[in-house]
Regions:
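Long, highly hydrophobic alpha-helical transmembrane signal-anchor segments
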Residues: 34-55, 145-177, 219, 224
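C-terminal membrane-associated helical module and adjoining short loops/tails
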Residues: 1-24, 143, 161-306
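Multi-pass membrane catalytic core of lipid/isoprenoid biosynthesis enzymes
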Residues: 80, 85-131, 177-186, 225-234, ...
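Short, amphipathic, aromatic/basic-enriched membrane-interface segments that mark the entry/exit
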Residues: 24-30, 94-105, 122-127, 145-153, ...
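Topogenic membrane-insertion module of multi-pass membrane proteins
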Residues: 2-88, 97-110
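Generic alpha-helical transmembrane segments of integral inner-membrane proteins
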Residues: 36-40, 58-69, 110-118, 122, ...
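Residues within alpha-helical transmembrane segments of multi-pass membrane proteins, especially transporters
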Residues: 43, 70-71, 77, 81, ...
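Short, aromatic-rich membrane-interface segments at the entry and exit
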Residues: 52-57, 125-131, 149-153, 174-180, ...
Length: 306
């Protein structure tokens, strides 16, 4: 029979939540979901019927995952002091908490970026350009642009546009005007709702993200409403003028947007500091909606007469 102290120690260990290793948290794999935009051109250009195009798209997706992680590490290096002062989630980031030193983080980035650029070169020169621009944009955002109102939103949105353009040049197809405008509008919606959630989930939000002192919940609501309407208008025009068969995806898209906004409304009530992406990857309904949208799109476009 164990002494009471030992039993208490074992109970404490069993009740302690499992913690993801610091290296994995540093890379933020949950955020790789955003790189699904890289696969958009593969679907809408009907290039998924080509094995070569599929392989190039998957390579582009993986490279962007690596580049995105490098960008997050750069951001965490610059934000380590403010992250340490954060009242909740950010203070536990590996660099801010001291689990991974700045020196080690710099070494990781210094090795990863040249390797990723080399891999991008083997996909295509244009794809290398897309990756390089994304890296520069990410660095500029971390250093300065995230403190500039409005510009910060468009910088976030531009990152999504570069993902889509990268996916297009990786398989040597032209990025359509409709896809460009729809992606930009959708990304602005995501950026505005993200800022809105930050304003609601932190009592002194502007102390930890300076740009928030220039925003209000009402303003973010206004921006997100404009962006989501623009997204539906441009997506609808694309369907009507180019791919009428994709009308079958509209109910799924509507559900996805409604569900996303619903999830964003939950965070302030529950007092959590989850990012929007964290919520999406943990929500079964959003996962099913995304899979359903992709499946319907592929089936409809595959059955479309050549």
């Amino acid at each position: 029979v164990l002494p009471s102290e030992s039993r208490n120690d074992l109970t404490a260990v069993n009740e302690r939540p499992l913690r993801t290793p610091a290296v994995i948290r540093l890379l933020r794999p949950a955020q790789w979901l955003k790189n699904g935009f890289v696969l958009g051109p593969l679907i809408f250009s009907r290039s998924f019927v080509s094995q070569s195009a599929v392989l190039h798209s998957l390579a582009a997706f993986l490279i962007f995952c690596g580049v995105a992680s490098a960008g997050y590490i750069i951001n965490d290096i610059y934000d380590r002091e403010s992250d340490r002062a954060h009242p909740s989630k950010k203070r536990s980031r590996p660099i801010a908490s001291g689990e991974i030193s700045v020196r080690v983080a710099i070494i990781v980035v210094s090795i990863a970026i040249p390797l990723l650029l080399a891999a991008a070169f083997f996909v295509s020169i244009k794809f290398l350009l897309a990756v390089a621009l994304y890296l520069l944009l990410t660095a500029a955002y971390s250093i300065r642009l995230k403190t500039m109102p409005i510009i910060d939103l468009f910088t976030i949105a531009s990152g999504f546009v570069l993902r889509v353009w990268g996916g297009a040049v990786a398989i040597d197809v032209v990025l359509s005007v409709w896809m460009f405008i729809t992606t930009l509008s959708l990304a602005l919606y995501l950026a505005a709702t993200k800022r809105r959630q930050e304003l609601l989930t932190t009592t002194a939000a502007s102390e930890f993200r300076a740009v928030l002192q220039h925003y209000s919940v009402a303003l973010m609501d206004y921006y997100s409403e404009i962006a989501v309407v623009a997204t539906f208008v441009f997506y609808g025009l694309y369907i009507v003028t180019v791919r009428p068969q994709l009308a079958a995806t509209v109910p799924v898209v509507l559900f996805g947007v409604f569900r996303y906004r619903y999830l964003m409304e939950l965070s302030p009530i529950e007092g959590t500091m989850e990012s929007p992406t964290d919520r999406l990857v943990r929500d079964p309904q959003m996962i099913i909606a995304a899979i359903l949208w992709a499946a319907i799109s592929v089936i409809v476009l595959y059955l479309e007469p050549s």
